[in-house]
Amino acid sequence: RKESLRLYFRRFTRIRVICEVGTFSPWVKPLLESLGHEVLVANPRKLRALYASGHKSDRIDARMLARVGRMDPALLGPIHHRSLATQADLAVLRARALLVRARTKLVNHVRGAVKSMGARLRTCSTPRVHQLPLEEFPEALRPALAPLLTALASITAQIQECDRKIAELCRDRYIETALPMQVHGVGPVTALCFVLTLETPERFKKSRMVGAYLGLTPRQHSSGERDPQLPITKAGDRMLRTLLIQCAHYILGPFGQDSDLRRFGKRMLQRGGKTGKKKAVTAVARKLAVLLHRLWFAGEEYEPLRSTRKQERALQPCA
């Protein structure tokens, strides 16, 4: 409990406290820091000796963390926890994502049930499935699907309410989201998630570091002359990574605006291959993350064809 921790750690002068990341670490860290202590939250992905040990207990884990922390704290891969206010705002985005997944499952079930009866629903967007007249569904399925359509209507209304809250947060509290939204295909949800996940652009010395932070760079396991191609690490925030992938699909799709990002992705698509499209989408998502951080950090105006125009000017003959 908070009060018990506060009473216990008040007895010490400034000390280094090392804890493992978990459900409680987001509030334990600021609590102990408020008492003047140095708090490091260990990243389990960086401590294989800890979670892959054959002899594992709380006491053994604590001893291992203490030894590593005394030797070199950087080996812990310390995790940066967001502020409580940022976590509360991120909860709105996570609630929306959960509602969207629930709606998708319900819609897929409804469409699948109708197809199994030899019928087919008319084409409509996912948010409008609940608006279809009940008479368009097979009569035998109407008693089973009616409550699902009611649930879909309620979920869609809740998603719209979340969208209103997100738009309000972008407008009133996080005006810096206007910088990422300059990019065609990046909306309020992605922009707010990007700003809240990174929290401050100064955390990264170089914009290129953002791609690795979000798990959009390939894993590496080279040895000697052997350097196999591996999938991306998928480290970092899964929700933001998913949103960036969705934005990349839009940028490369039929409605994407002509830009350096789109041209880069199209060149990768031309290479072909079984995984050509996946690689192109991932590469565009990675470049998009770098671009969004640069726009946010520098406060620059977005130029869709900036690199292309630079190359054209460089090729022009000198007067």
PLM regions: where:
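A detector of single, family-specific signature residues
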Residues: 1-319
